[in-house]
UniProtKB/Swiss-Prot annotation:
It is an enzyme of class 3 (hydrolase). Pfam families: Proteasome. It catalyses: Cleavage of peptide bonds with very broad specificity. The active site is at 10 (nucleophile). One of its GO terms (molecular function) is threonine-type endopeptidase activity. This is Proteasome subunit beta. It comes from the Archaea. The gene is psmB. The 20S proteasome core is composed of 14 alpha and 14 beta subunits that assemble into four stacked heptameric rings, resulting in a barrel-shaped structure. The two inner rings, each composed of seven catalytic beta subunits, are sandwiched by two outer rings, each composed of seven alpha subunits. The catalytic chamber with the active sites is on the inside of the barrel. Has a gated structure, the ends of the cylinder being occluded by the N-termini of the alpha-subunits. Is capped at one or both ends by the proteasome regulatory ATPase, PAN. Residues 1-9 form a propeptide. It comes from Ferroglobus placidus (strain DSM 10642 / AEDII12DO).
Length: 210
């Protein structure tokens, strides 16, 4: 089967902050030892205050991102309110579990801010969903990322501090994991805004780490 021959690697991280959440990924997509893309998108905006990161099969991730965005839009129309982070995580969990015998080859983070506060959920390929109370990393570079996150995370960290820590964690993984690399994407979400950092802003932070 193709899944026995094609492997995907990546690094994604999520941090719960006192004023929001931060999600970050690198941009490399691989097929075994082959670098298939240096511009892979791994963070998807789901609602105005919720995003999803993906690790795993690119095709499965893109399809799920489209499907989840449509379903959340329908939810908003029917309920006349935005879904909570937990509601989106539950939707994704149920969807993945419904096809568990032919699973989507993905590991996801759903993070955002709603009326209950800042939340991040990690979801495995067959729908297991866990609320992460502080930090989380997924993908082949996660061991290196966790080392940085666990040494530097604080319960009172704010989103701006968390952006720098997330970039540092991804950068550490990129140096040691061959399946991670080729740039970084970062999103910070607060009660008031959803911000995707520009390449220039990310590069300025990286310069301080080199």
């Amino acid at each position: 089967m193709i899944h026995d021959k094609v492997f995907k690697g990546t690094t994604t991280v999520g941090l719960v902050c006192k004023d929001g959440v931060v999600l970050a990924t690198e941009k490399r997509a691989t097929m075994g030892n082959f670098i298939a893309s240096r511009r892979a998108k791994k963070i998807y905006k789901i609602t105005d205050r919720i995003a999803m990161t993906t690790a795993g099969s690119v095709g499965d991730a893109q399809f799920l991102a489209r499907l989840i965005k449509v379903e959340t839009n329908l939810y908003t129309i029917r309920k006349e309110e935005e879904p909570t982070v937990k509601a989106v995580a539950t939707l994704v969990s149920n969807l993945l579990n419904s096809v568990r015998y032919f699973p989507y080859l993905v590991q996801l983070l759903i993070g955002g801010v709603d009326k209950t506060g800042a939340k991040i959920y990690s979801i495995d390929p067959i729908g297991g969903a866990i609320e992460e109370i502080d930090i989380v990393a997924t993908g082949s570079g996660s061991p290196m990322a966790y080392g940085v996150l666990e040494d530097n995370y604080r319960k009172d960290i704010n989103v701006d501090e968390a952006v720098e820590l997330a970039i540092r964690a991804i950068y550490s993984a990129m140096k040691r994991d061959s399946a991670s690399g080729d740039g970084i994407d970062v999103v910070k979400i607060t009660e008031k805004e959803y911000v995707e950092l520009t390449p220039e802003e990310i590069e300025a932070i990286l310069e301080k780490l080199r």
